[in-house]
Amino acid sequence: MKEEVFDIAVVGGGIVGSATFYQLQKAFPTKKLVLIEKEPKLAHHQTGNNSGVIHWGLYFTPGSKKAENCVKGRHELVNFAKEHGINHDICGKVVVATSSSEISNLEKILDNGIQNNIEGIERINADQIKEIEPEVAGVDGIWVPCTGIIDFVGVAEKMIQVAIGTNSSSKVYTSTKVVNIEQNEDE
């Protein structure tokens, strides 16, 4: 590989690396970026093998950076998917207590959701659980109508495509391992 100089390098081409590359290119459109992925394709590991759930902040401590970023990021993710025609479905989610001993944990999760401003979140009973999800049994539950699923591989690929479209000097290298990083002290 010939020697190239880039302003910013991102290592890893999963959803986090792809989103970082995309956001950096958006923030610094004249900078020459590189994304380096050791696998033959982007989103090869966790990103390409997860359930695709769009998280809405149920499990994060209210007021924490994780909760704040989750709330902000979910809206940005859904808007990005709509704008770029990426498969997604806001199908809702049921969180279930299968025994009375789990109800106190369910109440904590509900409280987190309310404090994290999750739209439409509500407590549901066993009959309502069956109505929404006939194959699920529970004694108590939470309905989160704004949760959904998304094609995270499609998101990662589209973020890279949009970033490269912003600056064609930026590059993505797959099947490339990072073995050493040196910082030029003069810059």
Q: Locations of the language-model features?
A:
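Short loop/edge segments at beta-strand edges and connector loops
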Residues: 37, 90, 124-126, 174-176, ...
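Conserved Rossmann-like nucleotide-cofactor binding loop
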Residues: 16, 20, 41
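Helical element adjacent to the flavin cofactor pocket in flavoenzyme catalytic cores
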Residues: 142-187
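Beta1/beta-strand and adjacent pyrophosphate-binding region of the FAD-binding site
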Residues: 2-16, 34
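Dinucleotide-binding Rossmann-like beta1-alpha1 core, especially the glycine-rich loop
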Residues: 52-132, 138
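Gly/Ala-rich phosphate-binding loop of Rossmann-like dinucleotide-binding domains
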Residues: 21, 25, 162
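Glycine-rich FAD pyrophosphate-binding loop
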Residues: 25-49
